[in-house]
């Protein structure tokens, strides 16, 4: 984007899906159900950003931490602030790894490179500095805190790790823009407490090509991340 852009989107809030593979493989989900609710009008403002795909910063495997309470991760994006409550007690390994990536500035100036917006699912995927869908740190870690529910197990606002198979978590994660049912293969590590409307508006504006899966039409970049 070359100038500040205001987005107004009518966003469908609830979806159902089955067997969606959310990872660095650009495989589109198969629609299995129609939208069942409407959330109304969403408006956000996105500023110009110089962020672009780049080589990942080399980061060693972070040390495991012991947490007495949840952490708060704030994504400062060109479209506004997204605040995430990180489930440090339910997903201590994941939050430890993310803490290391955040403090190492691994995510700074990275683009949210992929979205899905279909009758099956609505999500925004981020966390790959290369913006190719194949980037990540030099380490991987195991799954944890997988959902037990069979339906609507990834509600709107859920933040979970993307992967390429069991126990292959790295840095990429996705934020659910609508209530969705997925196979329970993706570590849930947080929920958005502020700024979900940003994700919803970006997702509702679709992909650059107009297809259900691909690079967002609206460029959204994580310019800086903090954790406390």
Range-by-range predicted roles:
Residues 22-228:
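Cyclophilin-like peptidyl-prolyl cis-trans isomerases
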Residues 1-11:
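Bacterial N-terminal signal peptides that target proteins for export
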Residues 11-19:
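Bacterial N-terminal signal peptides
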């Amino acid at each position: 984007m070359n100038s500040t852009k205001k987005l107004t989107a009518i966003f469908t809030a609830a979806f159902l899906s089955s067997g969606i593979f959310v990872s660095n493989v650009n495989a589109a989900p198969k629609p299995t159900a129609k939208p069942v609710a409407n959330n109304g009008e969403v408006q956000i403002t996105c500023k110009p950003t110089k962020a672009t795909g780049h080589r990942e910063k080399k980061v060693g495997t972070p040390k495991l931490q012991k947490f007495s309470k949840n952490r708060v991760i704030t994504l400062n994006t060109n479209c506004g602030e997204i605040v995430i409550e990180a489930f440090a007690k339910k997903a201590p390994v994941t939050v430890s790894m993310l803490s290391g990536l955040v403090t190492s500035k691994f995510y700074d100036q990275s683009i949210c490179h992929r979205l899905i917006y279909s009758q099956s699912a609505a999500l925004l995927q981020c966390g790959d500095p290369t913006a190719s869908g194949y980037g990540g740190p030099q380490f991987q870690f195991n799954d944890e805190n997988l959902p037990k529910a069979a339906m609507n197990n990834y509600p709107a606002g859920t933040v979970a790790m993307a992967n390429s198979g069991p126990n292959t978590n790295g840095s990429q994660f996705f934020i659910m823009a609508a209530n969705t049912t997925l196979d329970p293969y993706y570590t849930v590590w947080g929920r958005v407490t502020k700024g979900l409307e940003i994700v919803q508006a970006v997702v509702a504006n679709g992909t650059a090509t107009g297809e259900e899966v691909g690079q967002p039409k609206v460029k959204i970049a994580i310019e800086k991340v903090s954790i406390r």
